Structure formats: C-alpha cells, structure tokens
Amino acid sequence: NFRSALPDGETHHQYRAASDGQLGGIMKLYREWQISGDHQWLARMYPLAKKSLNYCIRSWDPRGKGVLEEPHHNTYDIEFWGPDGMCSSIYIGALSAMAHMARDLNRPEDAEDYRSLAEGGAEFLDKHLYNGEYYDQKVTYRGLRDTSFAKFVKRVNRKSGEVDKLL
C-alpha cells in the first residue's frame, strides 16, 4: 500500500499524515505510560510526542482554536476540510493526554498550553458542531491557509442547483 513499503524500506509518496493516526499515537503513548508507570520511559518519549503534536498544531490548527480546521487527511483516506467531530475529538484527547504527561514531567508551561487548547476545542465542538443529537462536520474551504479547494470551487459550474446544496 502507499503508507508502507514491503519489504521494509522508504515509501515514495507525498501523502499527508493521517490526523487520526498521528494523534492516536500520542494517546497510545499516554495509555502505555499509565499502564507501565515508567516515568523514565515517558521522559524519553515526551520530546518526540511533543514534536509530533506541535506538527499537528502547526499543520491543522494554526489559529489555535483546539480543533482541526485546515485540510487534514485521515485513515479513511480522505481529506476533511474544516472542523469535524471525529478527528477534532481525537485531537482534544491527544492535547489532554499531553497536558497530563507534561504536568507529571514538571513542564507546567506545556501542560497549560495543551490544556487550554483542549478546553477551547471542546467548547468549539459543543458550540459550533453539536446539533443536539450528534457532532456534525463543518465543511470549510474559505479563509484557510490551503486555498486549493477554494480555487477548485471557483471553476465549478454553478448553474446546477445540486452544486449549491453541496457547497
């Protein structure tokens, strides 16, 4: 498949990281630390997890809302444009996990930054995506750093009423 090479080796693609997989890795790190209680292991792994999470923040939440807004790939092998309940809830979980790990490692600034983002994200989901029954996706392509979809939409024939329903 395009994500791994068999036999083991370099993959030759330019695909984006899967947001749910990337963020799920941080939650798995937290789980393994909770099960093992190995603080030395956590201290070794934390800088790598921080690098991974900061990549996610820069790439998908550059405005610091606590939700993934920029186009983000996922393990369904599609791109989500705009905030969605699925990947954003995993993001909030990863932020919360990092806040707990940072606090345990006596990194209060990191803990507060991640906690604040997670709290803001949870509030955003409830306010903007919850429809009283479930969390919806808010498809967004305007006002993002990635303008490729907005440029594509400008070329779409708008004479069809169905197109307006989709956009």
Spans of features found by a protein language model:
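Aromatic-rich carbohydrate-recognition surfaces in CAZymes
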Residues: 1-64, 82-102, 115-118, 122
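Catalytic cores of carbohydrate-active enzymes
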Residues: 61-86, 90-167
